[in-house]
Amino acid sequence: MNPEQYLRLVQHDLDTLALLAKAAAGRTPPEDVSDWKCTLMFYMACVYVKALARSRQKDLQDHYNLRQWLNTTKDLLAITKPYRRLEERSRDARYEGRRFGGQELGEARSWFLQVRDHLVQLLEAAGVRAAPGVDPGPHL
């Protein structure tokens, strides 16, 4: 995939989050899908990283290589901590069945926004103009 295709996937993940949140809120009683909200935020962050990697002719095929690249690339070091926190929260949701309250969702959104803002700036500097600055906030 090229960077623009990855960025369309980010938008798709946001659209999926919106659909999920709307469907869950429409249930009686409302369904708690906070686990998937965190997971989708992590997936969007991951796809932003993959888009940047592709713009630099790198093909990251798994989370291990992605983390290794984040931890060893000078202009990405600023986002290693928020990215890792998002990944851990997503892992807790997927493998431990954790659900999250509003404060925890807000923290996850904050981490996501740090990653997104940094990567969108780098993508634009690399000439990728289709970098959407998606915000999951309205769907949390």
Question: Residue spans of the language-model regions?
Answer:
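Terminal alpha-helical segments
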Residues: M1-L140
